[in-house]
Amino acid sequence: MSNDRLAQLKTAIENSTYTVALCGSGCLKECGTDGLKSQERAYAIESKYGISPEYLYTSAYFSSRPKQFFEFYKEELLTPEIQPSGTSIALAQMEQEGTLQCVITSNIFNLAIRGGCKHVINLHGTVYDNFCTHCGHNHSIAYIKSCESIPLCEKCGHSIRPGVSFFGDMVDNALITKSIEEVKKADLLLL
């Protein structure tokens, strides 16, 4: 980014009374990984599992082939743990300074929260929420990774579901509404 563009951005942020950041695959790319929809990663996954990620990462596959789903989930989404990038840390600093009011993100790795942001809307959920479909108990990534086969709830023994929106799932309407409210309040959107 040129010095002129940086100066314009700085002025826009300083003059803003309500700033919202919209984050997605760009932040993920900055962390050194590609999303499942990137052409190179999708091809590598299809070569490895014999099925495209567009089918592997669906509610139908999770329900019909939970063992295979969790092999894919643990290998492709939980290993290695993706670390927050400079963007996530910079957004947290802006929030602490009072120049950023909200982060709306489509990534599922809690990058903004783990970078230090407090007011974050995770549109597609997060891999850090793995809940029992029966009692609702939340399970850590470490627990999911430690399970040899299909992870079952430590409390009641029922199946665990990742707290993410799979391909084809509807995004929670309450999160959409909350995001719209935040964007309406904003006089500056950072993309």
Predicted segments with their positions:
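Conserved catalytic core of sirtuin-type NAD+-dependent deacylases
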Residues: 1-191
